């Protein structure tokens, strides 16, 4: 990971933590990351398009997001660093998980787990790790049975 990604991601996280909106920004940045295609990010650094036009595109596309995230994306666009936005958001997530002591896990099973099974698994993992746990569930029909935790 490059220094730009670390610095900008850390700056965004520190601001969010100080202003008590880290949870809200985490939720919104995840949604934004899903929308950012490679083509869109390259458009945001295209020198043949004026900076003001690129920034207006960001304002139009993301007018409903938290002002800190919108301003962050505008700043990155202004500085020609728009392609670093997803990496900066990744750094934000890493710092969030470190600060709030959340462990990420992936549970892969042959069949979808019921809500009750998910709840029991999350409780057991939290008890064993002593931390909050965020589990991503994946179904892999090639598994014969059981579950794999990563």
Place the predicted regions along the sequence by residue.
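Elongated, mostly alpha-helical coiled-coil "stalk/stator" tethers of large membrane protein machines
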Residues: 1-150
């Amino acid at each position: 990971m490059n220094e730009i990604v670390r610095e900008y991601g850390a700056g965004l996280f520190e601001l969010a933590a100080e202003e008590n909106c880290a949870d809200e920004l985490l939720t919104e940045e995840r949604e934004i990351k899903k929308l950012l295609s490679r083509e869109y990010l390259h458009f945001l650094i295209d020198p043949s398009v004026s900076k003001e036009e690129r920034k207006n595109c960001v304002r139009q596309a993301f007018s409903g997001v938290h002002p800190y995230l919108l301003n962050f994306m505008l700043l990155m666009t202004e500085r020609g660093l728009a392609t670093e936005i997803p990496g900066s958001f990744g750094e934000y997530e890493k710092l969030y998980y470190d600060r709030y002591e959340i462990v990420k896990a992936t549970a892969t099973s042959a069949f979808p787990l019921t809500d009750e099974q998910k709840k029991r698994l999350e409780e057991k993992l939290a008890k064993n790790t002593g931390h909050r746990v965020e589990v991503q569930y994946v179904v892999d029909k090639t598994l014969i049975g059981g579950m794999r935790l990563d």
